[in-house]
Amino acid sequence: MYRFLGLTIHGGLIKRGLDNSDTRVVSASMGFYGRCVSLGFANKLFDEMPKRDDLAWNEIVMVNLRSGNWEKAVELFREMQFSGAKAYDSTMVKLLQVCSNKEGFAEGRQIHGYVLRLGLESNVSMCNSLIVMYSRNGKLELSRKVFNSMKDRNLSSWNSILSSYTKLGYVDDAIGLLDEMEICGLKPDIVTWNSLLSGYASKGLSKDAIAVLKRMQIAGLKPSTSSISSLLQAVAEPGHLKLGKAIHGYILRNQLWYDVYVETTLIDMYIKTGYLPYARMVFDMMDAKNIVAWNSLVSGLSYACLLKDAEALMIRMEKEGIKPDAITWNSLASGYATLGKPEKALDVIGKMKEKGVAPNVVSWTAIFSGCSKNGNFRNALKVFIKMQEEGVGPNAATMSTLLKILGCLSLLHSGKEVHGFCLRKNLICDAYVATALVDMYGKSGDLQSAIEIFWGIKNKSLASWNCMLMGYAMFGRGEEGIAAFSVMLEAGMEPDAITFTSVLSVCKNSGLVQEGWKYFDLMRSRYGIIPTIEHCSCMVDLLGRSGYLDEAWDFIQTMSLKPDATIWGAFLSSCKIHRDLELAEIAWKRLQVLEPHNSANYMMMINLYSNLNRWEDVERIRNLMRNNRVRVQDLWSWIQIDQTVHIFYAEGKTHPDEGDIYFELYKLVSEMKKSGYVPDTSCIHQDISDSEKEKLLMGHTEKLAMTYGLIKKKGLAPIRVVKNTNICSDSHTVAKYMSVLRNREIVLQEGARVHHFRDGKCSCNDSW
């Protein structure tokens, strides 16, 4: 109706020759056509104007902004400056709002320059828009600079800067701003408090979020639905069910139940705290279920691997007139992949196509990531290849997962290729990709590359710090790891339980007993983190390996958690190193109850008994293994030469170049003996002569792989070998000699430890 009326009026103006007579008339016409007819026609009217004043220029810029054509709007704004026309404050504020996305950041900086040239920095609305524009582009220091330059600040100014801090993760600084704001005589409103609640929620800091809520209530403000939703997000993690239920009670008492967003967030909270029955109850009680509510429950059921229930819910969903979207299907596909059923997950992709829902990069990444979580890396890589065949380009999440997989497989060469891809596609700026690169290089035995990437990250997340600390731990670089942790604390980053696992691993792998105790106590006293089994295992391993077996025993007896197989395994390993049979047999008995089929425990006892020449006990353990049908883990090592991975097995399949390898190895050992090498025959757990033991030592897979690397890898390229079990002390010694005699760096990886040999020394300083 209004469109027809507008066209009629404009037609009448044209008939009377008044359509171009007054710029106010033309400007109004441009506004009408831009809103109701066609942006192109509005621009045509502007182009045909014989004379343009400030009103016309500002109107055409606003017309393009309202229509979403921000690039044209910015172009017109530049032309406007050359014409001498003056931009209205409202036009520039709107332009700055549009330039808040990353694509428009450069234009936003130019508009800021225009503001400064015209002396408009006293305009509060303009400055508020500048604060928001800079913060949304991650430029917090520039946001603060604008805020500090403001002579007059209103409540919106304070909310803008406070929101900048919370959205970029600096919530504690935002609390400081809140205090400063109150000192200046301004009373925080609901927007202020919701910004703080949202900031704490995004970091999962439930206690801090609740403290803010209490402070808000003391100030006389009642929480809004947005406040409650943020609070629910903050407690949406395992262990916080009690808090979540308390908030649910508050919602009921204060009649906030009617809000769909609150109800949906409640469902999500119950799912993430692991209480699906309550999530279903909330869902069933909803009067109006939107697509988000359905997707939340389907996602929760899929995550819990209740896939039949998830599919049944999707059928019910369609019956109630809501069509499953890509998010719904992606949840189901991820569930099947996580359950170890990639074929079923790919079937979901087929069903999506049948239903007219186009699978996207998120769909494929969901399956890819699901296989990865399940530890099924081979299937994950197959899915990635299939994704490429379908013509779906990977995004940052895909590449992060791929890098994680390559790190777990120690495929450094492939990891470098993916790194190159990320550079070409400009994905390296993504925080998750950068962190995944640090993780991949650390786990693949290239610590230097991990360090270079890590220190190049501008806004380091807690996850990136944790990855870097674990990298130092893997290499036994204790002093550097502790120094990095100190820098992290100085930067204001608050450590979590994972951080302390990394820090204690740094201490454990470097034999730093005093530092280990210091950080274990600090974790509890300053940060209120309750020690987990992982933390306790690190302490037992640290104390035991350092020779403090009695202290390790006392620690086990007094720890608040019940010792599990991880604890007793670490203790048994320490007893084996220091040949303490009495304590070893106590640990062994506990392990027989906890994990009677773990071959590693049997092998540690065989190792200890053989070193004490108790051959009858060795045979007794071997018989026990046979009776319990415990199979010794296959032993192998591998090395990549060019594009080919060469695997060396302890038994069974031989390498085609075995003759050349043994010839070179015997030659090397002869040279080593002249330099002082004495074979450590205690690594062979058989009652045979030393000469026979020495021959068996030559067949250790890591030695064959290292020797093959020396033969095939010319120049000074490092020799990188991965072994699936712990290396023996003799192989460790041989690697040190090889690094000197052949002037080569050798990187030998065994599980979560990496030994970097250079000039006859190892990065672990023989603490392993």
Swiss-Prot record:
Transit peptide, residues from-to: 1-25
TM annotation in the entry? none
Cellular component per GO, a single term: mitochondrion
What are the record keywords, sorted? Answer: Mitochondrion, Repeat, Transit peptide
Q: Does the keyword Transit peptide apply?
A: yes
Where does the record place the region Type E(+) motif?
643-673
Q: Where is this region: Type DYW motif?
A: 674-768
State the compartments where it is located: Mitochondrion
Q: Tell me, what's a Pfam family for it?
A: E_motif
Ranges occupied by PPR repeats:
22-52, 53-87, 88-122, 123-153, 154-188, 189-223, 224-254, 259-289, 290-324, 325-359, 360-394, 395-429, 430-460, 461-495, 496-526, 532-562
GO terms for biological process, alphabetical: RNA modification
Q: Where is this region: Type E motif?
A: 567-642
GO MF terms, alphabetically ordered: RNA binding; zinc ion binding
Cited PANTHER family: DYW DOMAIN-CONTAINING PROTEIN, PENTATRICOPEPTIDE REPEAT-CONTAINING PROTEIN
The family note in this entry says: Belongs to the PPR family. PCMP-H subfamily.
Query: Any idea what this protein is called?
Result: Pentatricopeptide repeat-containing protein At4g01030, mitochondrial
